[in-house]
Amino acid sequence: MRILLFSRGRLARGAEELRQLLAVLERFGFDCLLNEEFAAAIREATGREFPADKIYGERIGPQPAGTTMVCYGGDGTLLEGVHRLGGAPIPVLGINAGHLGFLTGAPNEGLDRIFGEIARGELSVQPRSMLEVRGDFAEGPHSGLALNEFTVQRHGAAMLAVETYVDGQMVA
């Protein structure tokens, strides 16, 4: 089973917590891939190196069935991890290693239990709705996905027209 580990380069936790996380993942035999920033932060904190084929970049390509993304940080880390999935149907687990964690519900303590449940297929998945935003700009059309919200920022004096659709039906 594959685990996509995601975190930002700035980590609130120390080397020992990172070693514990990696040890638990190895104990359960997960095939782990890490984003570049997380791999660099672990290397800096622990001296551990990862082979190039275990590191992914900005976007995540197709993954085998049973893949789970584990976001290690706070809510902002989880939201960025979801963004990097680009709408791929991969379950996401947030481990709260930051200061606040409304979306990252799993505590940093109890990793054996959490990853044991994943390995045994016992962790329940709660489907979440995604928001898709599309816009027509001077440089061309652009779209993006969001888990819980998006913002529109004004740049200069411009008119804004908004059409809102839910499940393909225009509602506003």
What is each model feature region?
Residues 19-24, 86-87, 167:
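Short, solvent-exposed amphipathic alpha-helical segments in soluble enzyme
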Residues 10, 74-77, 98-100:
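Short glycine-rich anion-binding loops that position phosphate/pyrophosphate groups of nucleotides
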Residues 14-15, 76-82:
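Short glycine/serine/threonine-rich phosphate/pyrophosphate-binding segments
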Residues 84-98, 102:
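Gly/Ser-rich helix-loop-strand patches that form or flank binding pockets
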